[in-house]
Amino acid sequence: KMELILPCLYSELKGDALPKIVSEIAQTNYLHHIIIGLDQANEKQARKAWTFFEKLETPFTILWNDGPNLKKLDKELQKKALAPNEKGKGRNVWYCIGMSIARNSARSVALHDCDIKTYDRRMLAKLFYPVVNPLFNFEFCKGYYPRVADNKMNGRVSRLLVLSLIHI
């Protein structure tokens, strides 16, 4: 059973990338469940997010990170020094992974960004393939995708690798 984690900001629902990502994922038939970590959303926006993600053909859960239930959980975990210290994508992913563990039904979990403008559902298949193929002995896979816009390379790979090579 394959589960996907999508950490996103509410603002990404109106961007160029996430609507395409949801449309592409809706065309897959192998996901068992999707966990969506929703950041920077008030109650009205969280309801809109639910409607937005209903386009998915796969059952999903939205973790509303700014909602009362997660805030209460975060406070309890803070007291025990078990909660992430800072808000952001890391915290979002941390709680989504916790939800996946609590659900206890996934055999493999994939995670990817929600701002990939060049997204194609084959990216998701390529991300899962090494860990779900029984002929391979992989337990972890990290995928990279090009971030090219306006005839220039963007993103982490460009910033951390290419630019550092140029400055040598």
Q: What is each stretch, according to the model?
A:
Residues 1-26:
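N-proximal low-complexity "stem/linker" segments adjacent to membrane-targeting elements
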Residues 9-14, 41-43, 116-119, 147-150:
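Short acidic, S/G/P-rich loop/turn micro-motifs used as interaction or catalytic elements
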Residues 31-42, 63-65:
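Short beta-strand/loop segment that forms part of the nucleotide-sugar
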Residues 45-104:
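Active-site-proximal specificity loops/subdomain of glycosyltransferases
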Residues 105-117:
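Short beta-strand-to-loop acidic/aromatic patch adjacent to the donor-nucleotide binding site
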Residues 119-142:
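Conserved donor-nucleotide/metal-binding helix-loop-beta segment in metal-dependent transferases, i.e.
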Residues 137-156:
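Short beta-strand-to-loop element that shapes/binds the nucleotide-sugar donor at the catalytic cleft/hinge
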Residues 166-168:
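Conserved small/polar residues in nucleotide/adenosyl-binding loops
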